[in-house]
Amino acid sequence: GSEMCIRDRKVVLMGMGEPSHNLRSVFSAVEHIVRYSGIGYKEVVISTVGDKRLFKALMESQIKPALAISLHSAMDEKRRSLLPRAAELTVKEILEFGAKYAEVGKYPIQYQWTLINGVNDGVDEIEALAPLWSRQAILNMIPVNAVEGSPYKRPSAEQIERIKEACRANGILLKFRDSAAQDVDGGCGQLRARALKRKPAIQPAQELKIER
């Protein structure tokens, strides 16, 4: 019979903890992927909230993967409230490093931005971002997916269009993404366990009555 080979085109290291907390293993994994998969460094993406340790290591290393940095706001105080465990870096410091790394790596930095209604979806965000923006950068935006019990909601279609227009007017390259499967809670950020209200089939040990 015939054989079919599917070649991986991109690998994203995301959702496994902050890479700067485990640099040796992350760099080893990137090197292994590139060596044995046949894809280039620019097809391996490290996702990070931004950390000086990672930034320093990337500049000093021969390994030059692509980089996706969680930004979510152009305003320092707001960004710290959205990412309370992120390293103490200003938006300006993050974007300055991004510009330097893009120049060395020869491919653009991706900045991640989850749009939240009434939080970070204002045109003022884009106006604050524009003076710091580099040509070798891409802004990836995706509206937040609503989750029961969470106050965070998606912006209206009209507000999303205003954001897109503000990006165009300020020379910011925008890739706008939307999420599928929201109707079945299968979108990004919606996969989670719900507490069962009914009594579990297996009772905790302290509730079991054992007759001897």
Where are these regions (language model features)?
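Conserved AdoMet/S-adenosylmethionine-binding subsite of the radical SAM
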Residues: 7-170, 174
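Short, small-residue-biased leader/transition segments that mark boundaries at the very start
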Residues: 1-6
